[in-house]
Amino acid sequence: MTTKPAAEVSVAPGLFQTLKTFPATVHALLFFTFVIRFSYFMAWPFIAVIMTKNYHMSPVAIGVVMTSSALISVVLGMYGGQISDRLGRRIILLLGCGFSAVGYITLAQATGMGLFITGLMIIGVCFAWVDPPVRALMSDLLVDSRRRALALQMRYYLINVAAVFGPLIGIVFGLTSQKGTFLLTGLTYLPFFVYVLLFIPAGKLSGEQKNSAPVIKLHQVIGIIARDRIYIAALLCSMLCSVVYIHYEAVLPQYLMLLDGNAAVKLITVILVTNACTVLLFQSFIMRFLTQVSLPKRILLGGIIFAISQLCFFFIHSTEMWAWLMGTAVFSVGEAILMPNLNIMLDQLAPVEHRGAYLGASTLSTLGVAVGPLIGGVILAMTGAGVFICTALLSVLLCTIIYVCRISMLARLQDP
């Protein structure tokens, strides 16, 4: 099947007709992604609270633990991706589901800090051996770029739905900040494990076998990725996006606390809900209105909007709700454009024969999520609102990289 040009990688008018053409396995993968992330968002956003209240860990110690978990995810992601390229997605998904369930159940049952940290390290496998293989498997099953792009858009949309309602359901049932919630998260991996065991065939799919290359070792795969300048540029953009985004989630609330501790709690809640709702509403229009816009141009547009939103945050020196909601709306539009399209870019730049390893390497973007709060906290302490100038500059750097590499990216994306 001929690959369509990059300008056509998003959704065409027949959205639901296209969704109906997805294999049943893709629908199942999207469903299990939603279920897992829903339970994840009931517990994970409050993990720092648990580590502070239960184990009296300092912000620096929490940052070190989270960064270590992210590093494990990156290393295992490339190794697991290479295994899935050689042996198929099934075996690595089974290992990922099993380890993730064990990790979350360990968090739920931990009676001391050492066991709790051990659980966090095991959870590094969750992102490494579940998330990238799921994306790779969907790409294997959807051979044309247009349907792959739609599947990744839908996956991101479902994750945002989970991000909106997961914490709210957790609050309603009193599950937030409770270690027992991790037990629920761990148990959600078991149905997924059973599905993979029963319905995902062992070995490679027929399409993968046709495109299979001679087996190469992990260090050779890493060398191939390291020499792939276009992919590295896209990966760096993804990391920069993650750093800016995590500043919004982790550093912005601290800044609001500095402005007015009493008003901050309510404002933070309203801002987070506004962000998630704006992303959900706006993304449904993005897929239509940006259909004819090439991927690099979409990412460039999202980066510019990201930079503008950071400048908006910099110039707000009070806790006026309307001002923060306007800034959040601008930020959310940039997020809705950037996040899914960067994922689509990384997917389409990955060679078929090494797709698992390439998508495993894409977990490097989680380093931005891990180290962002630590770096942002230091800059916030030193400069106050100046932290948003730094994130605006990072957004400009993202735009610069995309602009410089846009021609090479387009040429590669348009290759059949």
Give a label for each model feature.
Residues 2-23, 201-234:
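Juxtamembrane intracellular "pre-TM" segments in multi-pass secondary transporters
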Residues 76-88, 281-295, 380:
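Helix-to-loop junctions at the C-terminal end of transmembrane segments
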